[in-house]
Every structure is written in structure tokens, then in C-alpha cells.
């Protein structure tokens, strides 16, 4: 046992373009639109609008004309069931004339996975934008993978960073070299700058071709930032773990589970520069700090460095002595660890200097492992139910106030002691009323707002892992992450006796801890003259009108910035450049630059034809989340409905009025035909749907929508449904690319469910396996090794492993493929649900559980009328009625 001191009141070498297909997906988009065009009439598309010229050695000759995306109107009522394959299509192509690019190539414009605009043709005037009622914003994802080594972005390390003297934008593929190449004209503000000395030379002074430079060829690239981009030496990555050791956390197994998970992942913490540091604070009604000494073998190796070996015999003698001492190593190390209790929560203080309590992982790893093994034993018999989170947060901030870092809170108890103490809010009579947002989704204590301001000053991020069967006030606690660049993860009903609960928690915490991070990051968007970023959505601290600050920048979040047109755009193209200054765990200061070029237009038809329905969905979602948190749930729902209604009305007025069928149909362009479906589904999402939704669940869902990368957000709004009982022979097996082939999805409606069928539903957070109540014994045997549906396990459980059943193997392959990801920490638990059957045995307890699960599944079938929300057909009819008034 440790001493208890009481009394203290190389990156992967693949260019990103290879990982981010562009041309093939644009061709896919063209083919999809062509199918619609053929159905509507003999429309023709120009191939040049949908592909770039192959990379050239020298700048191309000016293009003589500009080709725009074509608009194809559709009647939404003839598009039933909706063609959900559109949800997997890339956005409408961005048509940039070749003469506006220094060296045209597939990497000249930013891939949409990094920066995605709601409009791929920008109105030249604010009045035209208002006429269309379409929103203008960009979805930003600075990193695409949890580990930086999985993503190659070109790096300039020659110290030459070329920026415009007027607007401070960075040199990019869309500038113009003028005056025999001695100067360059900024594409953002049109200012003429001098080309710096050394621009056409390498580090050795040898001449190079400037058209081969990264900033000329690539719209996504990085600079190694010189010293003037830093205000101090790069800090080490520092993690402070606040562990809940109250009775509830011990009883449900969270303490033991989290301690073991942290122990197993100490080696996985980002530690590229060998400077990563760790501290642990255990919290109940007091604060328990730990002094962790250097590992014995580190001390011995230090001594050995100062000594010369006399001969091999002496070495052998020393090794024998070390072996004799090995039996005592565990006891000696554990005894050297000391715990200090601080019970004065009004003014929590550090019992030792912070450098004694925050220890280098490199030199203390073994002792940290000893400590993490011991902590569950020390508190296993506790009867203390209190949890002083507020004082613990203040103490953790004292520990790392000089370096910044991450505070990882793992808790199972509502904070009820000291500053920031919370109480259970009365939900009865408030849920599903106009008071829901103000009384249940607001921050209960101002401490959680003011503390994040201090965190931003000290470069500290707070992540929350809340796992409990009790009320946790996620709405209040999520403020800690929302404004510090972190995330709140919620595990309702967690209990370590459930293997599935433990699996999900440990998988997600492990991926979170191993995820690369950036420190002391700031992000800014610069736009062409006339464009300005005005609203910002995501988890960060908005330090000024256009500067977003991240104490640490994670790899699994995205952000959305609204863009306003403040002056008319006179040029044929406009530009948005996202620059992020950050410090990597390697100790390097980097600047990541992403430049997006967009055509401008005076045609409303072109604006509609180039609108991105998925990015628009994200835009409306972020604004609805803000409404729900800052106003009311009704105002959030009204925003969703009105946003779509305005777009449909404007489209009818500006585009469809010449069509005689405009009154009897509901028209929209083909590239936006999924938008009504997504808005109908968004209103049924747990974050927004009316009904008695527990506030913790509502707050957690709103929090997740704020940061979810776009493809996961779309799946959480419109779940992917697979029919499994009739999959083709090749599905569930490896294809020619050694990837497991997934079945084609079907529409999310119960009308397609057969009573004997087997279906898998993926909502990005969970997986649901629906077993039809009349499933045949052969199917049940192949999947579950039973021919009686009553014996099929229901609830949270994995499929049995039946190696003698090829069908079972294929289904498990499909589930594994869906869970396979390297861009999110989410691990999707599998829930098995039996459909109703006339032979279902009467069991009141089982019936209640089954009814709850069936209701949950029905909420994912978003094309149906569910939970007092209109079906998709009814929704379209209501929209048609509204715009024809």
C-alpha cells in the first residue's frame, strides 16, 4: 500500500488526395443527376463541369467559358419513397475555371471532407442570397483521423511563410503571379505583394520550380511555424484525471473500470516528444492527491550512466543483485507512493508543489500503474456518497495553470459538495412544456460558465465521462466541455456487471486517450472582400469576433461557420481560407491552411443547382441546437420547419412559377430533394422531438449534434437500415479491395419490414437487430443457434459466435465493418429486439422491456408517423399546404 498522508485540511506517405476521392465521386453525382434528368426529359450535362483537368506541369491557358451546374426540378410527391441513395452522394461539383488556378490539379481545391460549403455557387449579392432563402456557411473538419500518422498533409519546413501584407491570408493555389513572377496578387483581397527572397530555392539554396511548392499545388497544407508564432515554449501534453471515488462510482463499478482502462492506455497517451505528464485526483467529500515518485529502474539507469563497467564478471554480479531485489520491487515502489487528503473545500490548496503531483509519464509509468491498480482497493469499502467536482476542477486547474492541458472527469455522481454543487431538477410538469429549455436544459450554476473562461486563459480543456443510473445534470456539466474545446460523453444506466456496458465504455475511453491532440490552437476564417464569418458553432471559446480558441483541439469534432455577404462580389470566384495555428504533441508549432474556391453567380437557378443538402442540414441543425439551448424547444422546432418552408416557398416563387403544375405539385431541385426528408427526420430526433424525454438524454443528444462530423450527423438524423435475411451471396464477405461488402440500405420505414425478416439499423450511436416475430426456425438457427424465437436473447448483447454457420459469420462481419472507424471514438452497442408474434408468451416484465425496445426501434424508422410526429408523406402535404396559402 502507498503511504496515506492525512491532516491536510512519421506519417504515412500517401497524399491526402489519394485518401479523399474527388473526381470519381463527382462522376457518381453526375450519373445520379443524369438518371433524374432522363426521367424528366432529355437534359444534357457538360462533362467539363464535373471534373478537373489532370495536373499540368505549368499553369494552363485561360478557359474561354464558365460551365455551371444544371438545375433539374423534381416533384417531391413523385419521389416517394425518397431515393435515399442520394444521402451517400458527394456535394454538387465546384466549377472553377482553370485559368484561376496556378497549377490545376485534383489537389488545387480543398476536398469537401475538410471544408464543405452549403453553397457551391455563391450569390454575388446579399439580396440574391436572401431571395433563395438558402443558408450560407461552411462545415469545417481540420482533421480526418484520430491519429495524425493516418493522414498525410504536405508540410513546408523551409521557414518561408508567404502571407498577404493587407489581409494576412496565406499563399495558395488561386493567387496570381505578376510582373514576371516578382510579385503575387492575393486572391482574397487583390493586394499585390512581393515574392520573398528564397521562395524559388530549397533549404540548400539550389533553385526549385515554384510551381511544385506545396502551397501552390495543395489547398490543404501545413507550415512549420517559426518562433514568432509562439508566445512561449511548446508545453508538454498534460492529463489530469479526476476520478469519482464516491459510493455510487464504487458500487456500479465505474471506478474500477476507469482505473483499469487508464492503466491499460498509459502507453497509448500521445507522447511523441517524451514529455507527456499525468496527475490523478480522487474525489468524494474531499480531494485526494497522489505523489508518484520516479520508477526505480529509471533511477538505476541514471546511476548506471555515470559509471563505467570494469568487466563482464562485475556486470553479472550486479545483475544477480538486481534479480535478488526484484521480489521486493513491488512493495518498495508502492510504499513510496503517497496520498494527501485535503478536506477544506472552500479554499482547496495543493499539499505539495504542482511539479511533485504532475509527473512525467516517461519516468513514472510503472509507479502510475501501481497506483491505478491500488486505487479501487483503497476506496472499495467507502460509504461516502458526496462528490466535490467544483473544488476538484479548481484544484486540477491549479496543477496545470502554467502548462495547460486536459482535465478528464470520470464520474457517476451528481456534484453535491462545495462550489458548483448541483441539485436534482424537478422534471415532472416541466418536460415537454415551454419551460423545458429554461428550467432543464440551462446551466444550473454560474460556476460552470465562469470556470471555462478561466480554462481558456490557462489553455485547459475539460472532457466529461458521465456513467450512471442516476440523474447527472448533463445540461449543466456539458458547459465545461462546450466552451473549452472538449466533449461530454454520457453512459446512462452504466453498470460494470454488464459486459456490454464495460466494453462500450472502455473502447471509447481508450480511443479518446490515444487520440492525438493539438494544444494552444486558434482558428480563423478569412474571406474574399465582401465575405465575413459571422456566427460560429462547435466546442471552443470564441475569443474575438472572428477568432476561435481551442485549449486543445481534438480529432473527432467538426465546426460550422456562418458566412455573410456584406458587399457585392464582383469577381468570378470568391475564396474562404481556414487557418489553424496549433502545437502538436511532438512539440512543433504548426499552421494548417485550407483554401476553398467557389464560383460566384447572379443566377438564382445556379445557386439552387449548386446547393449542398447535407451541409445545409448541418447548418439548420446547429442553429436549432442553439435555439433549444438559448430559447425554447418550440423555437428550435419552428426554426427547422420554417427553414424548409422558406426554401420551398422561395424556390416556387423564383423557379417554379412558370410551371403550370406548381400549385398541384411540390417542386424542388434534384440536388435538394433529400432536404425535406432530413428536416422531417430531424424533428423526430431525440434532441428535438416533442414528448417526455428525460433532460439528461435531451442534453446529451444536443451536445452530440453540436460536434458530430457531417456523415455521422446525417446518419443520426436518418438512420441506415439494412435488410439481412435476403442479402446477396457476396455481402458480408471480402470484396476485391479486401473490404467487407455491406448490403444496400433500404428506406427507414416499417412498411418494408417483413414479419419473418431480419433487419439491422445503424443510427451512428447504436445498432439495432430486429428479428421478425414470425422468423423461420432455419434463420434463427443460423443466427442464434436456436429454433425458438422465445430463446433469442433481447436487449444489449452480441451475436453468438457460430463458426459452423456461414450466415452468422457474414452477419458478424457486417457488424464489425459498420463499427470499424478511425475518425470517431464511438463504439456502437448492439441491441437485439424481437418483433411481435401471436405466439408470444405472456410475461409482464418481459413485455414491458420488449415494448420499450420496440418503441426505441420505431423512433429510428423516421419516414413513419411516430411519437406524434407526421410521416414523411404527411410532412410533404403540410409543406405544400403552407406554401400554397
From Swiss-Prot:
Residue span of region Zinc finger-like: 164-189
Q: Does the keyword Cytoplasm apply?
A: yes
In residue numbers, the region (Disordered) covers 296-332
Recorded GO cellular component terms are: COPII vesicle coat; endoplasmic reticulum exit site; endoplasmic reticulum membrane; Golgi membrane
Q: What is its main location?
A: cytoplasm
Q: Which one of the record's GO molecular function terms can you name?
A: SNARE binding
Q: Which InterPro entries match?
A: ADF-H/Gelsolin-like_dom_sf, Gelsolin-like_dom, Gelsolin-like_dom_sf, Sec23/24_helical_dom, Sec23/24_helical_dom_sf, Sec23/24_trunk_dom, Sec23_24_beta_S, SEC23_SEC24_subfamily
Q: Which UniProt keywords apply?
A: Cytoplasm, Cytoplasmic vesicle, Endoplasmic reticulum, ER-Golgi transport, Golgi apparatus, Membrane, Metal-binding, Protein transport, Transport, Zinc
First and last residue of the signal peptide: none
Subcellular location field: Cytoplasm; Cytoplasmic vesicle, COPII-coated vesicle membrane; Endoplasmic reticulum membrane; Golgi apparatus membrane
> What membrane topology is annotated for this entry?
Peripheral membrane protein
Per the similarity annotation, which family is this? Answer: Belongs to the SEC23/SEC24 family. SEC24 subfamily.
**Record's function text:** Component of the coat protein complex II (COPII) which promotes the formation of transport vesicles from the endoplasmic reticulum (ER). The coat has two main functions, the physical deformation of the endoplasmic reticulum membrane into vesicles and the selection of cargo molecules.
The name of this protein is: Protein transport protein SEC24-1
Which species is this record about?
Saccharomyces uvarum (strain ATCC 76518 / CBS 7001 / CLIB 283 / NBRC 10550 / MCYC 623 / NCYC 2669 / NRRL Y-11845)
